[in-house]
């Protein structure tokens, strides 16, 4: 069985389905630090304006006072990649796929199933805080490595900020898809192409119920197709021709 890892997103939208918010034990130490921060501290840590930091401060306070609602993570996050993932009107098989084989890597919650209920928040590995004298990446590394040991065959759709959260020896069997546009024989990639393609790729995996590495090579989605000459055993390259 394939396991997919996807990142969080800054952009969110409030789904209709909500749950009580239950915070994992490992997240409690982070919440304690975040709730103690002033608006000015948050603005500096997030590198945002104080007006936006006030909103984030209220979210942390609501979590601490157990006033927050929680929503399925893959429906709450609404960044460009998420908007290209099929999330509505899923078949029974597709629903099982996204809830059992897709996990989200979070700097606040750890690694969680895609449908795990989470509260609205802003937090990533660029957030400048120390937990028990450790960076966020060091704090989460044992948890992340344990997940990797339990799921050796991972399809990683993660961005570069996660490269050194996992120890290198835990990623030996990982496959990282790469998405490129071809125009007049020239190949290019950039953030927008990659984010859209990650979502479309995951949707194609769900719809085709991909369970083996070889099945990924036959996927065609959003104009992309597998390019064997540019691919390696650990980096699958998908090309889309541009007019």
From Swiss-Prot:
InterPro entries: YaaA. One of its GO terms (cellular component) is cytosol. It comes from the Bacteria. One of its GO terms (biological process) is response to hydroperoxide. HAMAP family: UPF0246. Belongs to the UPF0246 family. This is UPF0246 protein M6_Spy1787. It comes from Streptococcus pyogenes serotype M6 (strain ATCC BAA-946 / MGAS10394).
């Amino acid at each position: 069985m394939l396991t997919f890892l996807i990142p969080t997103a800054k952009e969110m939208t409030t789904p209709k389905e909500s749950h009580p918010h239950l915070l994992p034990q490992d997240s409690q130490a982070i919440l304690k630090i975040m709730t103690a921060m002033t608006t000015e501290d948050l603005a500096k840590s997030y590198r945002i304006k104080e007006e936006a930091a006030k909103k984030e401060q209220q979210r942390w306070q609501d979590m601490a006072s157990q006033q927050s609602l929680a929503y399925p993570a893959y429906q709450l996050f609404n960044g460009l990649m998420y908007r290209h993932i099929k999330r509505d009107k899923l078949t029974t098989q597709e629903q099982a796929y996204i809830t059992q084989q897709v996990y989200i890597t979070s700097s606040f919650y750890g690694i969680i199933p895609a449908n795990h209920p989470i509260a609205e928040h802003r937090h990533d590995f660029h957030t400048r805080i120390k937990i028990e004298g450790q960076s966020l990446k060091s704090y989460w590394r044992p948890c992340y490595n344990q997940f990797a040991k339990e799921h050796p065959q991972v399809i990683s759709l993660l961005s570069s900020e996660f490269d050194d959260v996992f120890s290198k020896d835990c990623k030996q069997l990982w496959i990282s898809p790469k998405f490129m546009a071809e125009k007049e024989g020239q190949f290019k990639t950039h953030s927008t192409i990659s984010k859209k393609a990650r979502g479309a790729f995951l949707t194609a995996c769900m719809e085709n119920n991909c369970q083996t590495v070889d099945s990924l090579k036959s996927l065609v989605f959003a104009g992309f197709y597998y390019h064997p000459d540019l691919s390696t055993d650990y980096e699958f390259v998908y090309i889309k021709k541009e007019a």
